């Protein structure tokens, strides 16, 4: 059961956060030639790119993944990572995806997240899926 799908750049910050969560997850590939297809409803975990603006905030691999109508139809919520140095642009990728895909923006965390973020996301993801049934 893969209930989380995530993207992580070569910095691996989001990957480390997912590893610490200890929940089943699938990774959107870094390389364009590789594809991931969702096979059940999922929550997307995504980093925010750029310097706080809207342009370029959502990684192109995530855009390509969500441009697949099948993948987009199974999206149920979004969690975003960001850098508070970007001010109002903090976790902007989550805002953009939630708005465009009409799903809830469930949580935001900075960089690799804290222990409290890990606890909050574990609890929040569990409660979210319980409410979906």
Curated annotation (Swiss-Prot):
Pfam family, one: Flavodoxin_NdrI
SUPFAM superfamilies listed in its UniProt record: Flavoproteins
GO biological process, one term: protein modification process
Recorded superkingdom: Bacteria
InterPro entries to which the protein is assigned, alphabetical: Flavoprotein-like_sf, RNR_Ib_NrdI_bac, RNR_NrdI
A single GO molecular function term of this UniProt record: FMN binding
Family of the protein in this entry: Belongs to the NrdI family.
Primary role: Probably involved in ribonucleotide reductase function.
HAMAP family the UniProt entry points to: NrdI
Name assigned to this protein: Protein NrdI
Organism: Cronobacter sakazakii (strain ATCC BAA-894)
Protein encoded by which gene: nrdI
């Amino acid at each position: 059961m893969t209930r989380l799908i995530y993207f992580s750049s070569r910095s691996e910050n989001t990957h480390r956060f997912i590893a610490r969560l200890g929940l089943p997850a699938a990774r959107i590939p870094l390389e364009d030639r590789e594809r991931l297809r969702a096979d059940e409803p999922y929550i997307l975990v995504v980093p925010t790119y750029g310097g706080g603006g809207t342009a370029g905030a959502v990684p192109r691999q995530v855009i390509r993944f969500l441009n697949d109508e099948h993948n987009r139809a199974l999206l149920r919520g979004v969690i975003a990572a960001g850098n508070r140095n970007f001010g109002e642009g903090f976790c902007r990728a989550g805002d953009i995806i939630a708005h465009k895909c009409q799903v809830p923006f469930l949580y935001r965390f900075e960089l690799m997240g804290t222990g409290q973020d890990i606890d909050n996301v574990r609890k929040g993801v569990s409660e979210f899926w319980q409410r979906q049934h």
